[in-house]
């Protein structure tokens, strides 16, 4: 059994994203999000420990830009990243996005 390493609550989302690594610029979908990191559903894989730049499209228009380190990958499915060096403004936007997603999930469950 693996030890749970997550430090922040995650929410399920479906947000279009683009990411750029050392050798590639690719697209995918963020399907799991927290203030600490996310999982990107994509057939294009980054290397573990690779630093990537992530652009996540917001449901209200615009985008948020984040840097993260790949912490694990699942072949032909995607990879998880841990955010690094998030500015205060980006963290605030990330928290708003998570609150928005959490509210949508609660209204569906009700």
Task: Describe the role of every protein-language-model region.
Residues 1-33, 95-110:
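N-terminal helix initiation/capping motif
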Residues 57-62:
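Short, charged beta-turn/beta-strand-edge "cap" motif at the junction between a beta-strand
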Residues 13-55, 78-80:
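Short strand-loop-strand
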Residues 64-66:
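PAS and PAS-like sensory/regulatory domains
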Residues 73-101:
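C-terminal structural segments of small proteins and small subunits
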Residues 56, 90-94, 107:
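Short alpha-helical linear motifs
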